[in-house]
């Protein structure tokens, strides 16, 4: 661990929980949590360009890679430790997303960070899906960079967050090791309210820097628990004859409304033909200034 540069040399085969266990005694964390966190490795994250829990800004593992070491059929390919370089093509970009085609990633120097102690969280409801994604756009384009900016459509908010099923839910969360997060959260909440979002002031959760996480109560906490359980529920539902899966993409804001409408029409029709009906829901996994990354879930009886 290089505490001064905030970087660590980590072997590619380490599983997510073990990686965090090794960094914790030093007071650091990688802070990259894909949904497969428990059963996937650092090397796997890098060669698949894994998306993590940050919904804005540092959304993918790319942002944490300082240098890589890969064993290839032609020998060892190792890049230099540099904070950045403008000297031609980046060798790390060859490794990121290579999916094992070039060789086996054995280790990497990763950018790490101090464990966050300041947290702030809010969950706002909207009368429509459209109002919810307009709020998400306003927040991300203000460049406040919340760690969490998840939008759930009414179906997903109803099944995973315990809402009535006729409201969209926007989850906003900030975290920092050094700076209280009340100001950025209140600015994000203000923007979301202006777009039609609803939340009582007492439901806005802000920690005092004691390392106590917030946002585990109410609809926000219910969705978080559902998100963690989701990968394990598929085996159970498959045994009950339920056909279900997920798919995701990204698209620019100007094309998003018509794209979403077309996807929903096509999937609803397919579920009706194949399963006699079913459910389709959507949430934003990551949100960029120029567009969202929607994640669709569907299920029906086989």
Stretch-by-stretch model annotation:
Residues 1-150:
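FAD-binding subdomain of flavoenzyme oxidoreductases
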């Amino acid at each position: 661990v290089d505490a001064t540069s905030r970087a660590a040399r980590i072997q590619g085969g380490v599983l997510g929980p073990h990686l965090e266990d090794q960094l914790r005694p030093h007071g650091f964390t990688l802070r990259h949590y894909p949904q497969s966190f428990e059963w996937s490795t650092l090397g796997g994250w890098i060669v698949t360009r894994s998306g993590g829990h940050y919904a804005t800004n540092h959304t993918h593992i790319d942002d944490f890679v300082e240098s890589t070491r890969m064993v290839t059929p032609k020998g060892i390919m190792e890049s230099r430790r540099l904070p950045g370089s403008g000297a031609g093509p980046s060798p790390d970009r060859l490794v990121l997303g290579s999916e094992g085609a070039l060789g086996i990633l054995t280790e990497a120097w990763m950018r790490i960070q101090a464990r966050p102690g300041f947290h702030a969280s809010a969950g706002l409801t909207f009368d429509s899906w459209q109002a919810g994604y307009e709020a998400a756009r306003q927040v991300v384009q203000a460049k406040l960079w919340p760690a969490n900016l998840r939008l759930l459509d009414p179906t997903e908010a109803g099944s995973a967050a315990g809402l009535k099923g006729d409201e969209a839910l926007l989850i906003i969360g900030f975290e920092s090791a050094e700076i209280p997060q009340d100001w950025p959260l209140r600015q994000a909440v203000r923007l979301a309210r202006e777009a039609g979002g609803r939340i009582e002031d007492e439901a806005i959760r802000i920690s005092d820097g004691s390392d106590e996480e917030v946002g585990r109560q109410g609809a926000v906490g219910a969705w978080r628990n559902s998100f963690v359980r989701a990968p394990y529920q598929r085996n159970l539902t498959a045994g009950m004859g339920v056909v279900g899966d997920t798919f995701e993409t990204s698209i620019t804001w100007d094309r998003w409304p018509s794209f979403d409408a077309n996807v929903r029409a096509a999937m609803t029709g397919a579920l009706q033909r194949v399963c006699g009906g079913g459910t389709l829901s959507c949430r934003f996994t990551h949100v960029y200034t120029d567009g969202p990354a929607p994640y669709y879930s569907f299920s029906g009886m086989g």
